[in-house]
Amino acid sequence: MSRPTVVLVHGAWADGTSWGPVITDLHQAGIPVIAAPIPLTTLDDDVDAVKRTIDRTEGPVVLAGHAYAGGVIGATSHPRIKALVYVVALAPDEGETVADVFYRDPPHPQAPELKPDDNGWIWLPHNAFPEAFAQHATADDHALLAAVQRPINVPCIQKPVPRPGWKEIPTWFLIAEEDRMINPDTQRFMAERIGARTHTHTVDPAPLISRPEVVTAILSEAVQSVATT
């Protein structure tokens, strides 16, 4: 079996650069890695974008998603996906929407108010990056995140998902104890429900930026598991 490739999927208000530190770590470890750019237009569009990225790879795939992208990776069906890694991510069950699980528990007091603009796109206020999205990251990180953020279209979070891959595929979950975007209680509920190999850390909602070594360690564990299966 060829060495697994890690396919990384960014969440809302981000692009592939959000995985930059993790990509560097994986590359230095000799683990093949590629980031999937998703349009954040509809759930189906995002799933199709991930499938196109997987088609560019060879061999088994460890598919990882951050935040909103948990809904995307669970809905992505591809014969070469051998592991799913939820990085502080949402994991709706069949018939649920991303919004259903996101709003399952009360929001953090510093969580931003999320509402669409006149065209149906949801943007993150710039002050939310240092206050809630990545409070442990640097000021330079916050400036970059705000500058490159990509809005998410409302239909992405309103469509019920199909039978998710986590029902059949080995799954890992990183819980962020200091998350101000997705309630940690919601994360614990999802991790238990999907039967994930769970890692809990005192990190913010964006550890792929603020604590990439934590994320890399979990991805490496998944890669090793697939490689020895």
Which residues does each predicted region cover?
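Glycine-rich phosphate-binding loop signature in dinucleotide/nucleotide-binding domains
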Residues: 56-59, 167, 222-229
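Conserved loop-alpha-helix segment in the C-terminal half of the alpha/beta-hydrolase fold
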Residues: 177-209, 221-222
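Conserved alpha/beta-hydrolase catalytic His-Asp/Glu region
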Residues: 119-165
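Flexible "cap/lid" loop of the alpha/beta hydrolase fold
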Residues: 80-126, 153-160, 190
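Short beta-strand/loop motif that positions the catalytic acidic residue
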Residues: 173-175
